[in-house]
């Protein structure tokens, strides 16, 4: 697995991860763990990239697959030159349009 210094997060990803917390204590622990990671920030370029990607997906009739937050996460990774590490098939649709580097965290269907 990657070292913590090799991982980065962005605010939309943190919101998604923290949404899954089972309660206040779990939320606090997870938030503290995330604070130790490098943070990539949304920029106007990332916002524009997310919109371009959604438009390209719409041209193929696939714009209703990836959630808007997934488009923004992918765009932030792209503009910062980061590899998109994910466990969601919708990112495969995004990557086919953007051509950005991406990797599955684990083989699809193997994590709970």
Report the location of each language-model feature.
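IMPase-like, lithium-sensitive Mg2+-dependent phosphomonoesterase catalytic core
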Residues: 1-3, 13, 26-29, 102, ...
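A short secondary-structure junction motif
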Residues: 12-32, 51-59
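PIN/NYN-family metal-dependent endoribonuclease catalytic core
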Residues: 1-23, 37-45
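Structured helix-beta-strand junction loops
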Residues: 3-5, 33-37, 60, 80, ...
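Acidic, PIN/NYN-like endoribonuclease modules and their adjacent C-terminal/linker elements
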Residues: 74, 78-112
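Active-site neighborhoods of divalent-metal-dependent phosphate/nucleic-acid chemistry enzymes
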Residues: 39-85
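Alpha-helix capping/helix-boundary segments
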Residues: 13, 46, 73, 90-91
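A short acidic, often aromatic-flanked loop/helix-cap motif at beta-alpha or helix-coil junctions
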Residues: 15-16, 45-49, 108-112
């Amino acid at each position: 697995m990657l070292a913590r210094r090799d991982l980065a997060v962005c605010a939309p990803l943190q919101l998604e991860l923290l949404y899954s917390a089972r309660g206040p204590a779990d939320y606090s622990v997870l938030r503290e763990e995330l604070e130790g990671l490098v943070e990539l920030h949304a920029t106007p370029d990332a916002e524009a990239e997310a919109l371009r990607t959604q438009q390209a997906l719409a041209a193929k009739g696939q714009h209703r697959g990836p959630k808007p937050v997934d488009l923004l996460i992918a765009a932030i990774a792209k503009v910062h030159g980061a590899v998109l590490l994910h466990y969601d098939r919708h990112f495969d649709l995004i990557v086919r349009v953007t051509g950005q580097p991406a990797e599955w965290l684990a083989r699809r269907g193997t994590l709970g």
